[in-house]
């Protein structure tokens, strides 16, 4: 299993890659005129996992990662995030 960030047209997406090769998006960051909006995905309703207006993409990424959203989608405890950001697919 791997957790990694990938560039997208409008920001970055965080993915959990499962052992069977399937990828699940577990978070994302959008560039906006006001900064960066970040969401750590969940299977339920949790508005505290979404926040707007981060001044930097690194702060937005730290916010998403703080929730460990991959744990909810099949990740294992202690899973490390791949360093860097992959280019768009």
List each language-model region with its residue ranges.
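Short beta-strand segments that buttress and anchor functional surface loops
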Residues: 15-18, 40
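Detector for glycine-centered tight turns/loop "hinges" at secondary-structure junctions
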Residues: 21-23, 45
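Mixed-charge, Lys/Arg-enriched low-complexity segments
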Residues: 1-6, 35-89
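Short glycine/proline-enriched loop/turn "hinge" motifs that connect secondary-structure elements
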Residues: 29-31
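Short, hydrophobic/aromatic-rich segments at coil-to-beta transitions
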Residues: 8-15
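Intrinsically disordered, low-complexity proline/glycine-rich segments
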Residues: 25-27
């Amino acid at each position: 299993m791997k957790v990694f960030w990938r560039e997208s047209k409008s920001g970055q997406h965080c993915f959990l890659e499962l052992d069977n090769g399937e990828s699940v998006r577990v978070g994302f960051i959008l560039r906006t005129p006001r900064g960066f909006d970040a969401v750590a995905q969940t299977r339920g309703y949790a508005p505290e996992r979404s926040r707007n207006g981060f001044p930097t993409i690194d702060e937005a990424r730290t916010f998403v990662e703080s929730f460990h959203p991959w744990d909810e989608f099949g990740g294992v405890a202690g899973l490390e995030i791949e360093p860097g950001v992959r280019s768009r697919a």
